[in-house]
From Swiss-Prot:
Top-level taxon: Archaea
Subunit structure of this chain's protein: Part of the 30S ribosomal subunit.
Function (record text): Located on the platform of the 30S subunit.
Matches recorded under InterPro entries: Ribosomal_uS11, Ribosomal_uS11_archaeal, Ribosomal_uS11_CS, Ribosomal_uS11_sf
Protein name per the record: Small ribosomal subunit protein uS11
Xref: PROSITE patterns: RIBOSOMAL_S11
Gene3D superfamilies on file: Ribosomal protein S11 (3.30.420.80)
Single GO cellular component term: ribosome
Annotated source species: Pyrococcus abyssi (strain GE5 / Orsay)
GO molecular function: rRNA binding; structural constituent of ribosome
Keywords: Ribonucleoprotein, Ribosomal protein, RNA-binding, rRNA-binding
PANTHER family: 40S RIBOSOMAL PROTEIN S14/30S RIBOSOMAL PROTEIN S11
NCBIfam families: arch_S11P, PRK09607.1
Ranges for region Disordered: 116-137
Amino acid sequence: MSEEQVNIKKKEKWGIAHIYSSYNNTIIHITDITGAETISRWSGGMVVKADRDEPSPYAAMLAARRAAEEALEKGIVGVHIRVRAPGGSKSKTPGPGAQAAIRALARAGLKIGRVEDVTPIPHDGTRPKGGRRGRRV
């Protein structure tokens, strides 16, 4: 490779897209590769008016698109994605907005590196709510 090609490769700036998706909201937070500096942060509640629309895939898509536009303006060309659900004693599965957010980031022109699930898993942590016999429906 010539020296010019090496310089072009070095200048590619990557970030991390932290996607927190619950059944109440979706939060997209893009940071630099170390995770220390925030580049862009959007949530479903920031892009829709009605509270009931916050967790929807549509709100997640809009939030991800705006976050991606902001990141591209600041020189980020690609992101590694870290998906997180509430976890712990709460839901271990990401909400409905997670997949839509990943798709929107890809469509917005960001390169996608690795996608990993960083949901906290308890190693026998706190007692789940609902009492001894669980939630009776």
